[in-house]
Amino acid sequence: MRTLSLLLALLFLAAQTLAQPIDEGAEEVITEEPEITETQDPTTIMLIERGIGGDSTDATRSTITCYCRSRCRMLEKNSGTCRSSNCTYTLCCKKTS
């Protein structure tokens, strides 16, 4: 009997949710990305890579350099997008030792 009343309550809530009008005036969430152009200095990120054992004493330092370009060059990886002057570009990153 409890199960039946629980199912009826869930069915009632689902029907109420579907019957409510959708608010078309809801605000949009806009996320802004940092603006980077190809002529500006590249973004450089220092990373510490850990060895297989995860031991911090075996850490080696490497640098990842990122540019905003229309296309990634050889050995660069597409790491997302960036915007400049209402244009969207590819964020191209390259790992150097």
From Swiss-Prot:
GO CC aspect terms: extracellular space
SMART domains xrefs: Defensin_propep
PROSITE patterns: DEFENSIN
Chief location of this protein within or outside the cell: secreted
PANTHER family: ALPHA-DEFENSIN 1
Family membership: Belongs to the alpha-defensin family.
Protein's name according to its UniProt entry: Defensin-A2
Taxonomy of the source species: Eukaryota, Metazoa, Chordata, Craniata, Vertebrata
